[in-house]
Curated annotation (Swiss-Prot):
GO terms (BP aspect): L-arginine biosynthetic process; ornithine biosynthetic process
Family annotation (HAMAP family): ArgJ
EC number: 2.3.1.35, 2.3.1.1
Physiological role: Catalyzes two activities which are involved in the cyclic version of arginine biosynthesis: the synthesis of N-acetylglutamate from glutamate and acetyl-CoA as the acetyl donor, and of ornithine by transacetylation between N(2)-acetylornithine and glutamate.
Assembly behavior: Heterotetramer of two alpha and two beta chains.
Residues carrying the site annotation Cleavage: 179-180
Database matches in NCBIfam families: ArgJ (TIGR00120), PRK05388.1 (NF003802)
Name of the featured protein: Arginine biosynthesis bifunctional protein ArgJ 2
GO cellular component, one term: cytoplasm
Length: 387
């Protein structure tokens, strides 16, 4: 999608350029609010978290920010003290150029791990950036944060007079354990810091934290939201609903663009003892290489789903005799379908989005997670990815 001026939140501007970090495409994105924002961020729990994560986590502790720096094609992870110094220098340079206090800036970085930033190029490219800020171009920003993505990822909604927009990137090294790959949300709605924090974290937990491409949690996962309040207050419930819709849209875009992916997998587990159990079982299914390859081959092999459920060894209250497995609405376990239904099941498994539904019949809680199939393309892309 492309945003029009009428669908763009007011009071934001951007500076987007190529600094030569890896190639000739946009690799530096700066998004600024005209006024200080209520803000929140959630980040990777990886033990190898990069300086961008640690700095942003610190800067957002007070629930305020006015700008976000996003660098693509280089994660700046595992570079020791020099990597920390480089990230801090970039924040200081942007602060000097824009007049925003360094502590009111967040930074995110994505790309190859273990390479230092080309800091001389970055220094040169940021000279005069404060005078080059233009009306916010969220479409270009979504393209500028891409690495191995094949399409940009953007979504928007309106609540009353306020607009919300979200951009994200990610196709591999994706099983968020806090937040997401990289995702950024901007709104001109007025909202308190505590309310924003509650809504944002609930949204992330039920969308991005329910996404898995390859079970690998990134060292750079970051999700940040800025709300500048210029459009005034909006109903909290409507704001929360709109934010969740945007996040859900972005999750599906990421799943569709998973490295080598041809299909989205949606797994819903219901009748669980609690939400955590439902989510654990659903994740076990969507993460299974055998389930993923069965989906790729349009093979309705429900035994692989049963296997994935069975791996959840800590869920001692799951009784196989009570479990029901469906592909779409067709029940495959207990095995009640006839041989003539096999073609129908193959049709279901051939869709661009394959729905797997499991009922545990223990309690009342439900969780839905998303992923994609596993193909030769994933191996090819990652086998050739240069360090």
């Amino acid at each position: 999608m492309s945003l029009t001026a009428s669908s763009t939140p007011q009071g934001f501007s951007t500076f987007i350029t190529n600094l030569g970090i890896r190639d000739t495409t946009e690799d530096f994105v700066f998004l600024r609010s005209d006024v200080p924002c209520v803000a929140d961020g959630v980040f990777t729990q990886s033990l190898f978290a990069g300086p961008s994560v640690t700095i942003s986590r610190q800067n957002l502790q007070d629930g305020q920010a006015q700008g976000i720096i996003i660098i693509s094609k280089n994660a700046n992870v595992a570079n020791g003290a020099v990597g920390i110094a480089d990230a801090q220098e970039i924040i200081q340079l942007v602060a000097q150029e824009t007049g925003i206090a360094a502590e009111n800036l967040a930074i995110a970085s994505t790309g190859v791990i273990g390479r230092r930033y080309p800091i001389e190029k970055i220094r040169a490219g940021l000279v005069g950036m404060g005078q080059k800020l233009t009306a916010a171009d969220f479409d270009l920003a979504a393209r500028g944060i891409m690495t191995t993505d094949t399409v940009s990822k953007i979504a928007a909604r309106q609540v009353g007079n306020a607009k919300l927009v979200g951009i994200a990137k990610g196709v591999g090294m994706i099983e968020p354990n806090m937040a997401t790959m990289l995702a950024f949300f901007f709104t001109d709605a007025a909202i308190s810091a505590n309310t924003l924090r509650q809504i944002f974290r609930s949204t992330i937990d039920k969308t991005f934290n329910c996404l898995s491409i390859d079970t690998d949690t990134s060292t750079s996962d970051s999700a940040v939201i800025l709300a500048n309040g210029l459009a005034g207050e909006v109903p909290e419930a409507e704001f929360a609903s709109a934010l969740q819709e945007i996040a859900h849209d972005l999750v599906l875009k990421i799943a569709r663009d998973g490295e080598g992916a041809t299909k989205v997998i949606e797994v819903t587990v219901d009748s669980a003892a609690n939400y955590a159990q439902a989510k654990r079982v659903a994740k076990a299914i969507v993460n299974s290489p055998l389930v993923k390859t069965a989906v790729y081959g349009a093979d309705p092999n429900w035994g692989r789903v049963a296997m994935a459920i069975g791996k959840c060894e800590d869920e001692r209250d799951i009784n196989p005799d009570q479990v029901v497995i469906r592909f779409d609405e067709v029940q495959v376990y207990p095995n009640t379908f006839q041989a003539e239904n096999l073609e129908k099941l193959k049709e279901i498994m051939s869709k661009e989005k394959v729905n797997i539904h499991v009922s545990l019949n223990i309690g009342t809680d439900v969780a839905t997670v998303w992923g994609c199939d596993l193909t030769e393309g994933y191996v090819e892309i990652n086998g050739k990815y240069s360090t």
